[in-house]
């Protein structure tokens, strides 16, 4: 299943200007109950009219495991949140094209905007022609005078991503010991920076996000609340007191207010800040009566 915000882009949920309006059809093959690929269904859904097979590496607003690089074959891969987490990238195992965001892992917290496309020449050129116009492709486009931030952020990205991973592992260990379901758990291998924590009630999701916001370097005085965000079929709450608007390699958390009431935590430009964010989230949950200080002492 794609990210919620892509459902209207594709046309799963009706929307003006969707791919469906332009006659582009879409088929979805879900993972099997054990998280493996349904190869029979995949074969059934590919025919001579198929132009693109794509896979989403990260979990989105689901609680399934993130897909490892080794499991991704010759596809177009949405690589968001997965860059620099493993020793290989999807292109190393045959992916035709990988795409992602520069305000996530590869921007290192410095890139203020942008995305990337990498892969086989034909695929990159096709994407470039669609982005601009036929005949121009990637030969034109605004650089906005910020290329230095791109390069410096890319240089720092592996270190920043490592700190975010450490923060996610810390969160998993603490919240699992408090009795909440976490994906992945504190000892499982990781393939992106996202930590899912299932609270089973909206108060937990809201309290967690309010704690993360309170730890932010920007707008820490703001109290996030769920709202009807465009592109989603349920209210969503987001905590992101970041230097770069929308940056989720910076300390952030979000989640839809619907069952199973899971929150998705990611980022932290340093491991110390990620740890501080988790401690603030615990403080808010204590204030809301969802956990006790004694439980936290035992979990730590």
Put a short name on every predicted segment:
Residues 1-166, 172-175, 179-183, 272-300:
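Conserved PLP-enzyme active-site core in the AAT-like
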Residues 176-299:
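Conserved C-terminal alpha-helix-loop-beta "cap" of PLP-dependent enzymes
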């Amino acid at each position: 299943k794609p990210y919620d915000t892509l459902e209207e882009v594709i046309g799963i949920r009706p929307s003006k200007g969707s791919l469906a309006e332009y006659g582009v059809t879409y088929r979805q093959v879900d993972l099997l109950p054990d998280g493996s690929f349904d190869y029979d269904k995949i074969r059934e859904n590919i025919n001579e009219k198929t132009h693109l097979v794509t896979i989403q590496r990260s979990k989105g607003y689901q609680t399934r495991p993130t897909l490892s690089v080794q499991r991704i074959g010759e596809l177009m891969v949405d690589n968001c949140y997965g860059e620099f987490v493993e020793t290989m990238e999807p292109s190393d195992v045959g992916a035709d094209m990988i795409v992602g965001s520069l305000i996530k892992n590869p921007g290192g917290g410095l890139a203020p905007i942008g995305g990337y496309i990498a892969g086989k020449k034909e695929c990159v050129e096709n994407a470039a022609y669609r982005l601009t116009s036929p005949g121009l492709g990637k030969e034109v486009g605004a650089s906005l005078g910020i290329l230095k931030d791109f390069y410096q952020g890319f240089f720092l990205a592996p270190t920043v991503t490592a700190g975010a991973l450490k923060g996610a592992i810390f969160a998993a260990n603490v919240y699992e010991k408090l009795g909440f379901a976490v994906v992945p758990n504190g000892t499982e291998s990781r393939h992106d920076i996202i930590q899912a924590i299932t609270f089973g009630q909206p108060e937990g999701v809201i309290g967690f996000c309010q704690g993360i916001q309170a730890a932010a370097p920007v707008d820490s005085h703001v109290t996030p609340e769920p709202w009807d965000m465009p592109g989603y079929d349920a209210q969503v709450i987001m905590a992101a007191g970041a230097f770069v608007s929308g940056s989720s390699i910076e300390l952030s958390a979000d989640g839809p207010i619907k069952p199973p009431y899971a929150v998705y935590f990611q980022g932290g430009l340093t491991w110390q800040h990620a740890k501080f964010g988790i401690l603030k989230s615990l403080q808010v949950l204590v204030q809301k009566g969802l956990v006790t200080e004694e439980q936290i002492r035992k979990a730590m």
